[in-house]
Amino acid sequence: MADNSTHPIMKILESFGLTDVILAFFLSMVVGLLLGALVYMILTWMSRRRASATITRIPVHQSRSTTRSSSPRSRLGYSRHSSGYDRRSNNSLASAAFSFHRQTSSSPIDYGDSTGRKSSFRASTFHPLLQCSQIAREAEEGAQGSLPRTPTLTTSPGAAGSTSTVSSMITPPRARNRPDSFWGNSNLRGFHAGQTPPPAYDSIIRAYQETTT
């Protein structure tokens, strides 16, 4: 005998109809999509609102209080930096003005030779070593000019030997000529020309051979 029993789910589906089931499925899908889109829009709006709230400006009274509390330090730092910059600029301007005044006020023969010729190298730039040597030369000339003069002794002709000895004792010693330094007044002269030259190489070899033998 054939089994005429059917499944209960099939009975339920047969009672609703196939077209009604398909329509209900699509309607539920559309409603779910609409609800999901609505929830997504609400969440994005809330997140943007929270982000914009963190970026918004501080109220006026709070900003004033914060600027008052932080202004002394910032102003102090700014004043320090500005004062340092002004000091540097003033120093550079003063040095430039001083050098320009020094170059324009110098006469053309201040650093010239003894004959009065103009030396372009000395008159163009500032040379403290040359000034020091010039000051020392002037001091030496002043010291020589301030020495007492030799008194003239009037004696008889018979005492010629005594007068010569007395005059030799009284006359001041001659001013020694200063050797030219390595750094000359106008150029590099090197060592003094009057220095003894080194011994010859042959004489050194001969002396060494004599000492060894």
Curated annotation (Swiss-Prot):
Its main location: nucleus. The lineage of its organism: Eukaryota, Metazoa, Chordata, Craniata, Vertebrata. It comes from the Eukaryota. It comes from Danio rerio (Zebrafish). The gene is myct1. It holds the Pfam family Myc_target_1. GO terms for biological process: embryonic hemopoiesis. It is found in: Nucleus. This is Myc target protein 1 homolog. Belongs to the MYCT1 family. Residues 59-89, 139-201 are annotated as: Disordered. A motif (Bipartite nuclear localization signal) lies at residues 48-68. Keywords: Nucleus. Residues 63-75, 146-168 have a biased composition (Low complexity). One of its GO terms (cellular component) is nucleoplasm. Transmembrane segments: none annotated. InterPro entries: Myc_target_1. Disulfide bonds: none annotated.
